């Protein structure tokens, strides 16, 4: 049987600020790079005091086309109020580049069985947000990494690389597939040492 080609699919973060959701597939391996919320998220339907109702999981998000319907990605609890069927996870991981909401806000809806990879410091910040109530991400299989510690997931190897950004512990990723490398910068700025 011939192996499928590596591919890259953009579900957000193209032609907009934030909302990065980039899917990398190689053979049977599927990983996301970030899973955030766009800066313009729902602005045509809501305001600061009127937004998708959290108690309805993804129902409002799907009805208003604010988040993509992707089979095997979302938790059963998030899908329960919707007519979208739950299926077992079909993704092997989600890599979060840094703590900013436009790169991680929608991990709260992901199936708990999908590992979430993030830098050690980003994980500590996320934990503090959970503790203080700033963010609600839920229980997940969090796996931390450091620069120089590549993560191998089936057919894909992800190399985390520190980038300069307005928050500590920001990463870009070099994603090694069977057909070559994909470089994902996350967010970066051109300050600091060269």
Please report, for each region that a protein language model flagged, where it lies by residue.
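His/Asp/Glu-rich metal-coordinating catalytic cores
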Residues: 2-16, 20-93, 102-194
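An N-terminally biased module of ancient metal coordination in phosphate/nucleic-acid-related enzymes
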Residues: 96
